[in-house]
């Protein structure tokens, strides 16, 4: 079905899939006033956990959408992960001590409860609707938008953009006609979620035992996940047998017959990435864009990164602040990092789960030898191996010959600061939901110049001057448009000292779009307006007027019973 090119969209964005990526994206769009429709083929949210680990970047995103305080009660912060060999000798430990982005790096969590909080957050917006029991059938793109049709007698919907957050078997991806390149492991695992944790300790472990590798993860609220490798001569039917499940649990607990099993299932690991994250007015996020093994707990978090990266860009285009070309930077920025996460997760899985005793023994000797080297031990302990976003292309501006210490393309830190009115607040709460221009102890209006200052102000940017605490209340060049913050922990002074750049242009997703010394701020600001595809006037986007129609949010239907398996490609 094709809509006439001049048809007025019913909504700005259709999000296909009410999983974590789709719900996070809908919250971001909702906060920016974007008329959004979320559709899902199920009749309710999935009620069983898939992901079990939240990282600091995801919590920072939940902070940005105003839901972190509702999420935190369902988490286990600062969760330690230990790796043991077959004799239960410690191979490695991950216990990252810092919280440079404002939150712990490793957190166990109960996904259904966190997803429910994301879903509940949409009740804040009259212009966001969720429709369950809507299976997308097709997308027909025109110059003016996309017409989405559904199975049955559901009415079609016209939108300006469609984002597929519809999982590994994504219908959106098939409609786009893009590949899903990669591999599916031949190794199968039995995952068992249990209530009333029979172990009861707060942390997690991986048993790298070649006889049968296993995982034991404390989630939250007394829930624990066990995972056991299934041998090649064991069928899926055998692994699904309750007696087999109890036998596996008996390897880890003394009374397996007393364990309260919530759910068990057999799954395999996928290492796949879509050929493109964008094609015209259709985009992909979350598992629809990439699948990765569980070993780094980054599948869920990578989907949240997608939403954070894409959300502000979609809102800027729909609201007329940027041209459509800004959306091309989504694929440029997210693809490389998602690929790095897939590769790391795949590699860690190969290290953890060899069943050849000779290879496992060699691995153990190498790791034990490396652990006596302090720098290598810290590298693992502090999770320094985790790939961090560093965008060389996209919605960022780099000098022709950038300094090796340039922070451009990386995430800005989030220490706690003082303002003149509040104490001990997280920096992002001062920076606000949009763009921010940040400097170290300088007159920001004078540094930028009136033209650049006014243009950033017209885009809703906030201006923040960071100072030593001794200067917090000095009124020398106070400006009503500039928020002064005191560096209560010293983290900002240390950060600016290392980077050497003193003026930062920070995107809504907290990536540093550009950085420079004070004297170059006007020219870097001008260059950024070009690479960010920002419009000077802030009128309509490149594809017609913004839709001013709104849709109402509907309540969630009754809970779906357990037993539905996640799809595989």
UniProtKB/Swiss-Prot annotation:
Pathway(s) this gene product operates in, as recorded in its UniProt entry? Aromatic compound metabolism; 3-phenylpropanoate degradation
Q: Which SUPFAM superfamilies match?
A: FAD/NAD(P)-binding domain
Biological process (GO) annotations held by this record are:
3-(3-hydroxy)phenylpropionate catabolic process; 3-phenylpropionate catabolic process
What catalytic reaction does the record list?
Answer: 3-(3-hydroxyphenyl)propanoate + NADH + O2 + H(+) = 3-(2,3-dihydroxyphenyl)propanoate + NAD(+) + H2O; (2E)-3-(3-hydroxyphenyl)prop-2-enoate + NADH + O2 + H(+) = (2E)-3-(2,3-dihydroxyphenyl)prop-2-enoate + NAD(+) + H2O
Q: Which GO terms describe its molecular function?
A: 3-(3-hydroxyphenyl)propionate hydroxylase activity; FAD binding
Q: Which UniProt keywords apply?
A: Aromatic hydrocarbons catabolism, FAD, Flavoprotein, NAD, Oxidoreductase
Domain of life according to the entry: Bacteria
Give the protein's cofactors: FAD
Pfam families from the UniProt entry: FAD_binding_3
EC number assigned by the record = 1.14.13.127
UniProt-listed Gene3D superfamilies:
3.30.70.2450, FAD/NAD(P)-binding domain (3.50.50.60)
Q: Which residues bind FAD?
A: 12-41, 277-287
Q: Which NCBIfam families match?
A: PRK06183.1-2, PRK06183.1-3, PRK06183.1-5
Q: Which HAMAP family match?
A: MhpA
What role is this protein assigned? Answer: Catalyzes the insertion of one atom of molecular oxygen into position 2 of the phenyl ring of 3-(3-hydroxyphenyl)propionate (3-HPP) and hydroxycinnamic acid (3HCI).
Q: Family per UniProt?
A: Belongs to the PheA/TfdB FAD monooxygenase family.
User: Under which name does UniProt file this protein?
Assistant: 3-(3-hydroxy-phenyl)propionate/3-hydroxycinnamic acid hydroxylase
Tell me the organism's taxonomic lineage.
Answer: Bacteria, Bacillati, Actinomycetota, Actinomycetes, Mycobacteriales
């Amino acid at each position: 079905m094709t809509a006439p090119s001049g048809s007025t969209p019913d909504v700005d964005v259709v999000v296909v899939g009410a999983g974590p990526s789709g719900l996070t994206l809908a919250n971001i769009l909702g906060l920016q006033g974007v008329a959004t429709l979320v559709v899902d083929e199920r009749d309710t949210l999935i009620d069983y956990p898939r992901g079990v680990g939240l990282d600091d970047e995801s919590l920072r995103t939940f902070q940005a959408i105003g839901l972190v305080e509702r999420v935190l009660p369902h988490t286990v912060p600062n969760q330690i992960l230990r790796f043991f060999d077959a004799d239960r000798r410690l191979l490695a430990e991950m216990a990252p001590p810092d919280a440079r982005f404002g939150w712990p790096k490793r957190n166990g969590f109960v996904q259904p409860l966190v997803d429910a909080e994301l879903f509940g957050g949409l009740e804040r917006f009259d212009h966001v609707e969720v429709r369950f029991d809507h299976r997308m059938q097709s997308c027909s793109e025109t110059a003016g938008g996309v017409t989405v049709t559904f199975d049955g007698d559901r009415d079609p919907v016209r939108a300006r953009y469609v984002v597929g957050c519809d999982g590994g078997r994504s219908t959106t991806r098939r409609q786009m006609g893009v590949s899903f390149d990669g591999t599916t492991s031949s190794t199968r695992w039995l995952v068992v979620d249990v209530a009333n944790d029979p172990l009861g300790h707060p942390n997690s472990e991986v048993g790298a035992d070649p006889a049968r590798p296993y995982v034991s993860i404390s989630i939250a609220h007394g829930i624990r996940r066990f995972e056991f490798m299934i041998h090649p001569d064991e069928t899926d039917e055998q692994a699904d047998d309750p007696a087999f499940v109890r036998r596996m649990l008996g390897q880890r607990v003394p009374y397996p017959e007393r364990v309260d099993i919530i759910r068990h299932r057999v799954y395999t690991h996928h290492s796949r990435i879509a050929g493109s994250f964008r094609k015209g007015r259709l985009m992909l996020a979350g598992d629809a864009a990439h699948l990765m093994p569980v070993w780094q707990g980054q599948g869920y978090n990578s989907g949240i990164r997608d939403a954070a990266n894409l959300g502000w860009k979609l809102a800027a285009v729909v609201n007329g602040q940027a041209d459509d070309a800004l959306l091309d930077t989504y694929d440029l920025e997210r693809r490389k990092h998602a690929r790095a996460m897939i590769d790391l997760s795949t590699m860690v899985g190969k290290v953890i789960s060899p069943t050849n005793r000779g290879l496992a023994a060699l691995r153990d000797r190498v790791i034990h030898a490396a652990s006596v080297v302090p720098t290598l031990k810290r590298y693992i302990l502090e999770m320094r191996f985790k790939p961090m976003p560093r965008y060389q292309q996209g919605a960022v501006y780099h000098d022709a010959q950038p300094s090796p210490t340039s922070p451009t393309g990386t995430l800005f830190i989030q220490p706690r600061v003082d303002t003149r009115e509040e104490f001990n607040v997280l920096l992002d709460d001062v920076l606000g939901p949009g763009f921010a221009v940040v400097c170290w102890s300088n007159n920001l209006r004078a540094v930028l110049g009136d033209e650049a200052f006014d243009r950033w102000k017209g885009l809703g940017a906030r201006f923040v001057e960071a100072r030593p605490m001794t200067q917090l209340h000095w009124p020398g060049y106070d400006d009503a448009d500039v928020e002064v913050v005191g560096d209560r922990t010293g983290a900002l002074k240390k950060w600016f000292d290392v980077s050497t750049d003193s003026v930062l242009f920070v995107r809504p997703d907290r990536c540093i779009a550009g950085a420079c010394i004070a004297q170059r701020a006007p020219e870097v600001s001008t260059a950024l307006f070009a690479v960010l595809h920002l419009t000077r006037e802030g009128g309509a986007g490149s594809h017609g007027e913004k839709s001013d129609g709104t849709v109402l949010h509907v309540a969630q239907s009754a809970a779906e019973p357990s037993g539905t398996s996640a799809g595989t490609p």
